[in-house]
Amino acid sequence: MVEIKPTKQQLSFLDWEMGAFFHFGIRTFYEGHRDWDGKVMDPKAFCPTGLDCENWIRTIKEAGLTYAILVCKHHDGFANWPSKYTEYSVANTPWKNGRGDVVREFVDACRKYDIKVGLYYSPAEAGYQERSPKEHDDYFINQIGELLGNYGKIDYLWFDGCGSEGHEYDKKRIVTAIRSLQPEILIFNMWDPDTKWVGNEAGVANVTNSNVVSSLDFSVLTENKDDLATERFLPTECDFRMRNRNWFYSEYDVHTVKSVEELVSLYYYSVGNGANFLINIGPDRRGLLPDVDARRLLEFGKEIKRRFSQPIPSTWETTENGIDIKLDGERLINHVVLAEDL
């Protein structure tokens, strides 16, 4: 029997426990637009009046989160950095007269506050079918090269499979490019994955969630699975939205911000079932976290700290019948945290 063990990076990922997802880009400035709706979004609309990535990262740090993921390019194709391989980027916006770089500001903020750096990239985008498969792979690998080659150490690369159904990517070439630039990086869910998607966007892992799998859920658009050919250890991640309706900011769904009780419940359904908790907040058109969302995240973090930050002193030893746990006296216990010894 082959023993399946996690890598050092995967063990670190499990210890991260809670992260933040930031959907911010051209769609932030176009109310009501949806994935793949074909609507034109002029880059001239991108002009945050007070972008402050430190505002984002300070908030999640205070809430007890340990990693953050920025959407660098969503399905619309807009690049949040001045990519040499497209004109559809921050370089052709009025923000900072075209000299701004959201990715740079995000990465610098994460490093300042000791938050692990994650970058999201959608391999597919509107109109990509007009390129030949090789042309699209060239474009994709060139942009990934910019993200992984120009911003120092990146801890996590988050690929979104949505929209990639049917395209045959050059897997070997892609993985070689990524691993050569960032040998210790964690890759989410695709091609040579180190972590896996839970299979829903509700933030919920099943009680039977296992980190040892032989196939992966690929996209919300299909029930097809990606066959891994062999069993692998892949920690699970549960992504979900602070607001019930949108990943990007909307001025019309503030009433759907989740309550502290809902967030705590999702913590139990994710971390409590052996998965990571990844909450999305869409920064607003100022380039700041919406006040209501930021306040709710801090309230949630305070509640998690209240429940878990002062464990009861104990010792334990293994016996023939299991494990004996000894406390320092009579105690009322309302939570038990169990973890596999890896």
Which residues does each predicted region cover?
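Mature catalytic domains of secreted/periplasmic carbohydrate-active enzymes
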Residues: M1-L342
